C-alpha cells in the first residue's frame, strides 16, 4: 500500500489534488484542512491512506500524520466510509473534532452533511476513548490565502457541493455573506459552513 507520496502539485482543488510523482499523476482526495495547508504549487509530501474497493483504488492524502490518524479512526466506525470521513475532517478541524467527540457534542457532529443523530452518537460512543490518546499538540491553524473574489466564490460553491450541500442552499448562504475583496477561501468557507450548520 502507498503510505507517503512526495511530488509536484500539478492541479489543486478544494477536494483533491493531482500530485506529479516522477511523471505519474496521482489523484489524491484531500480534506479542507489539508487544502488550506498546501501551497498553490511546488513540492509537497502527503501521508496517504489507500482505499481499495472491488471497482476502484482511491488515495486520500493528509498534510500531517495526525490528520491521517483521525481519518483512520473515523473509518473504524461502522457506517463511516472514506468519503464521509474526509467530509467530517473538511467540516470540523482535528482539534475541534477531538473536543466534540470527547464532550459528546452530537449537535456539532450531526451538522456535517451525511451524518445523522445515530451516526453522531455512534462516533462519540466508539471514538471518545481513542481520541483522548492522540497527541493534538502538533495541530496548527493555517494562514489564509488571498484570491480574486469571483474565483473565490466559485471555489467555495464547488467545495460545498462536494461536501453534499445542495446548490440552491449554498448560493443562498453565499448571497448573505459579504466576503470583500481581501477575503480568503478559508475565511469565506468557514463563514459559509457556520451558516449552513445552523
UniProtKB/Swiss-Prot annotation:
Residue numbers spanned by region Domain III: 153-198
Principal subcellular localisation of the protein: cytoplasm
Family: Belongs to the RuvA family.
Region Flexible linker, residue ranges: 143-153
Protein name: Holliday junction branch migration complex subunit RuvA
Spans annotated as Domain I: 1-63
InterPro entries the record matches: DNA_helicase_Holl-junc_RuvA_I, Hlx-hairpin-Hlx_DNA-bd_motif, NA-bd_OB-fold, RuvA, RuvA_2-like, RuvA_C, RuvA_C_sf
Cell compartments where the protein resides: Cytoplasm
GO molecular function, one term: four-way junction helicase activity
Function noted in UniProt: The RuvA-RuvB-RuvC complex processes Holliday junction (HJ) DNA during genetic recombination and DNA repair, while the RuvA-RuvB complex plays an important role in the rescue of blocked DNA replication forks via replication fork reversal (RFR). RuvA specifically binds to HJ cruciform DNA, conferring on it an open structure. The RuvB hexamer acts as an ATP-dependent pump, pulling dsDNA into and through the RuvAB complex. HJ branch migration allows RuvC to scan DNA until it finds its consensus sequence, where it cleaves and resolves the cruciform DNA.
GO biological process, one term: DNA recombination
Gene Ontology cellular component annotations, sorted alphabetically: cytoplasm; Holliday junction helicase complex; Holliday junction resolvase complex
Lineage, top ranks: Bacteria, Pseudomonadati, Thermodesulfobacteriota, Desulfuromonadia, Desulfuromonadales
Source domain of life: Bacteria
Domain notes: Has three domains with a flexible linker between the domains II and III and assumes an 'L' shape. Domain III is highly mobile and contacts RuvB.
UniProt subunit comment: Homotetramer. Forms an RuvA(8)-RuvB(12)-Holliday junction (HJ) complex. HJ DNA is sandwiched between 2 RuvA tetramers; dsDNA enters through RuvA and exits via RuvB. An RuvB hexamer assembles on each DNA strand where it exits the tetramer. Each RuvB hexamer is contacted by two RuvA subunits (via domain III) on 2 adjacent RuvB subunits; this complex drives branch migration. In the full resolvosome a probable DNA-RuvA(4)-RuvB(12)-RuvC(2) complex forms which resolves the HJ.
Region of interest called Domain II, as start-end residue ranges on this chain: 64-142
Keywords, comma-separated and alphabetical: Cytoplasm, DNA damage, DNA recombination, DNA repair, DNA-binding
Amino acid at each position: 500500500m502507498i503510505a507517503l507520496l512526495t511530488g509536484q502539485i500539478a492541479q489543486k482543488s478544494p477536494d483533491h489534488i493531482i500530485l506529479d510523482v516522477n511523471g505519474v499523476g496521482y489523484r489524491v482526495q484531500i480534506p479542507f484542512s489539508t487544502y488550506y495547508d498546501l501551497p498553490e504549487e511546488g513540492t509537497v509530501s502527503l501521508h496517504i491512506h489507500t482505499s481499495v474497493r472491488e471497482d476502484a483504488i482511491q488515495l486520500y492524502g493528509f498534510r500531517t500524520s495526525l490528520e491521517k490518524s483521525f481519518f483512520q479512526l473515523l473509518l473504524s466506525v461502522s457506517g463511516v466510509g472514506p468519503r464521509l470521513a474526509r467530509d467530517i475532517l473538511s467540516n470540523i478541524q482535528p482539534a475541534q473534532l477531538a473536543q466534540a467527540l470527547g464532550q459528546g457534542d452530537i449537535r456539532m457532529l450531526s451538522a456535517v452533511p451525511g451524518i445523522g443523530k445515530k451516526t453522531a452518537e455512534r462516533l462519540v460512543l466508539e471514538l471518545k476513548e481513542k481520541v483522548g490518546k492522540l497527541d493534538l499538540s502538533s495541530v496548527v491553524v493555517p494562514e489564509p490565502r488571498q484570491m480574486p473574489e469571483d474565483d473565490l466564490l466559485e471555489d467555495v460553491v464547488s467545495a460545498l457541493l462536494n461536501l453534499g450541500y445542495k446548490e440552491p442552499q449554498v448560493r443562498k448562504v453565499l448571497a448573505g455573506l459579504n466576503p470583500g475583496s481581501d477575503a480568503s477561501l478559508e475565511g469565506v468557507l468557514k463563514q459559509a459552513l457556520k451558516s449552513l450548520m445552523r
